[in-house]
Amino acid sequence: MTKDFLPTNTFFYPRTRLSPYFEGTQAAGAKAYSVYNHMYLPSWYRNTDEEYWALTKDVVIWDVAVERQVQIKGPDAFKFTNYITTKDLNKCKVNQCKYTLLCDGSGGIINDPVLSRLDDNLFWLSISDSDVLLWAKGLAHNSKWNVELSEPDVAPMQVQGPKSKALMISIFGPKVESLPYYHSMETTLSGMNMLVTRTGYTGEIGYEIYLRNAKKDGIKLWNTMLEAGK
């Protein structure tokens, strides 16, 4: 059984990253943060019961910039990504997403990212909590694969709940309605560039917005989504 601990204050340490949406989560009343992928993750706001019912009956937005992206591109990006993941990516088309595993040589799970295929030889891994970029660079170093590994300036935001589809259609138009489960589309909003995916881990219908140029546009997107959801 997990032991309950008394809540404590959070001290924001400069060696741990702030999300591009951090100021927005502060303004929204975030009461606690945890550290995930070396970045602060808002854990709860005013009332956890209210947040649960908002998710299951309405629509919520979440700062999940902690799902940091590992970008794999280059002539051998497909071969390399197909090697390090457990999915057969021959069955993954461009603009399709896959939930997959990264394993060590003994089959132990290193990470369980959601993979997005943006082009024939361009992939993003939206990772859970471990240093996948360093691990992948180690595999690629002095190897047979011609790949470039990096972390793009991208920050995911989740839009989840039974009313998420209506909200997304009101913002992005009817093209969102036809987006299949675990597929993606590139789009723009008020000069902001982003990848929208029909993904999420809530058990409710939902989407994720992968904002490009997130350091510049993070608060702009956050405020845009809040205003649209009123």
Labelled PLM ranges:
Residues 48-57, 102-112, 141-144, 188-196:
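Short amphipathic beta-strand starts and helix->beta connectors
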Residues 63, 112, 208:
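Acidic active-site catalytic centers that drive phospho-/nucleotidyl reactions
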Residues 1-37, 41-43, 116-230:
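Conserved, structured C-terminal
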Residues 68, 98, 111-112, 145, ...:
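Residue-level marker for the onset of beta-strands and adjacent loop->beta junctions
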